[in-house]
């Protein structure tokens, strides 16, 4: 199983838990509350990025969010930063490795999301490819 570096304060842990819950529940309103106004989103290896809460939310609403229950998130850490591994439900109802979210936490919420669209990274975190 993956490891997670516990944040030093409960507020940061709550922020991470709420981020994961927003994706798992396809809850755009909840995610809106968590993102700083100047949040940045990158999705390597795709050469696309977004800056600003509205732009990030429009993108996620159009292409990333699915139905509640179709995503499962597992907290982990990467390079000393909080991260979450994202699993997505396939047509066969199996949850498969999808991407790894590296999160930069700011003073008022999530300041940056770098989402690596590479399921092969899961093994580096000790995570299975399916759940």
Language model features by range: what are they?
Residues 57-131:
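Low-complexity, glycine/alanine/valine/leucine- and proline-rich hydrophobic stretches
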Residues 1-66, 70-72:
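Solvent-exposed, charged amphipathic helical/linker segments at domain boundaries
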């Amino acid at each position: 199983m993956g490891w997670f570096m516990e944040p030093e304060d409960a507020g940061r842990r709550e922020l991470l838990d709420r981020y994961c819950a927003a994706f798992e529940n396809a809850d755009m309103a909840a995610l809106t509350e968590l993102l700083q106004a100047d949040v940045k989103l990158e999705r390597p290896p795709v050469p696309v990025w977004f800056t600003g809460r509205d732009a990030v939310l429009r993108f996620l609403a159009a292409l990333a969010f699915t139905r509640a229950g179709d995503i499962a998130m597992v907290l982990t850490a990467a390079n000393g930063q909080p991260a979450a591994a994202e699993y997505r439900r396939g047509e066969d109802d199996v949850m498969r490795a999808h991407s790894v979210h590296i999160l930069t936490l700011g003073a008022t919420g999530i300041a940056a999301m770098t989402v690596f669209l590479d399921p092969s990274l899961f093994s580096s975190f000790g995570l299975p490819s399916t759940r």
